[in-house]
């Protein structure tokens, strides 16, 4: 039993010693398969349609199509980059079917 415990501790020490920021389950790069936006470094797990595999994608830039926050964690259109707002008419049906799409706008610049 002591040998198993020592082997386990050595394995954990080696695993923590490797300074690899890339993740297997979290901190996924763009293009890698994901199950939820929380896994991606960009915080956008995107799929083309209901039958495609979801992959990490960059957030939407200004004047690009976007989605408001979704409960599912997977987007058909990625949310906006930091500092931009997704100008969308939110509906209950759109929230359920994940079809609340809009356009990313910089509201600070739009009011000037």
Curated annotation (Swiss-Prot):
Belongs to the colipase family. One of its GO terms (cellular component) is extracellular region. GO terms for molecular function: enzyme activator activity; lipase binding. GO terms for biological process: digestion; lipid catabolic process; response to food. Its main location: secreted. Disulfide bonds join 34-45, 40-56, 44-78, 66-86, 80-104. InterPro entries: CLPS_chr (IPR047576), Colipase (IPR001981), Colipase_C (IPR017914), Colipase_CS (IPR017915), Colipase_N (IPR017913). This is Colipase. Keywords: Digestion, Disulfide bond, Lipid degradation, Lipid metabolism, Secreted, Signal. Colipase is a cofactor of pancreatic lipase. It allows the lipase to anchor itself to the lipid-water interface. Without colipase the enzyme is washed off by bile salts, which have an inhibitory effect on the lipase. Forms a 1:1 stoichiometric complex with pancreatic lipase. It is found in: Secreted. Residues 1-17 form the signal peptide. Gene3D superfamilies: Lipase, subunit A. Residues 18-22 form a propeptide.
């Amino acid at each position: 039993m002591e040998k198993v415990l020592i082997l386990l501790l050595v394995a954990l020490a080696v695993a923590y010693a490797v300074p690899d920021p890339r993740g297997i389950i979290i901190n996924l790069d763009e293009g890698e398969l994901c199950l939820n936006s929380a896994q991606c470094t960009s915080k956008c797990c995107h799929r083309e349609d209901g039958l495609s595999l979801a992959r990490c994608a960059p957030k939407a830039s200004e004047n690009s199509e976007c989605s408001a926050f979704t409960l599912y964690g997977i987007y058909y259109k990625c949310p906006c980059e930091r500092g931009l707002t997704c100008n969308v008419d939110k509906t209950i049906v759109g929230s359920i079917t994940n079809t609340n799409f809009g356009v990313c706008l910089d509201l600070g610049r739009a009011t000037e």
